[in-house]
């Protein structure tokens, strides 16, 4: 996934939050591209804000499913779970059948994806499993 807008346009899912994790100072063309991204998408949300938005849904049994692998994704997902007490962190549904059973019993799932780190096939497989098992996808949290 290259841009947060793709989540809405390609999959029709609401974007709950965009968490910016890049803190390095870029130079030259990369710096200009980063400024253009910030002007289009904003500066991003904090983990506390995203946790508060998820808590405001008033759904006590939500699963936060991580799509992809990476230290940045793992750390940010744990921070969001801390700030949203209603969340349970899990991996991808297509990797574990027990997670599918947990997702069916929950109020829904929220996908957490990494911009530039999560591929389309992973998200599409996850959404296909959710459609087959009647699991509601409440939205997506993007990390970039």
Regions found by a protein language model. Give the residues of each.
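Short boundary/hinge segments that flank catalytic cores
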Residues: 1-91, 115-144
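Inter-motif core of Ras-like GTPase G domains
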Residues: 96-116
């Amino acid at each position: 996934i290259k841009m947060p807008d793709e989540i809405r346009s390609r999959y029709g899912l609401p974007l709950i939050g965009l968490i910016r994790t890049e803190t390095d100072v870029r130079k030259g063309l990369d710096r200009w591209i980063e400024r253009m991204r910030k002007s289009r998408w904003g500066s991003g949300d904090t983990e506390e804000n995203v946790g508060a938005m998820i808590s405001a849904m008033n759904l006590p049994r939500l699963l936060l499913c991580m799509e992809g692998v990476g230290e940045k994704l793992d750390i940010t997902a744990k921070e969001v779970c801390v700030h949203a007490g209603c969340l349970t962190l899990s991996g991808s549904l297509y990797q574990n059948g027990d997670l599918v059973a947990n997702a069916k019993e929950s109020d829904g799932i929220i996908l957490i994806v990494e911009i530039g780190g999560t591929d389309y096939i992973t998200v599409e497989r996850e959404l296909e499993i959710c459609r087959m098992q009647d699991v509601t996808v409440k939205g997506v949290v993007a990390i970039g």
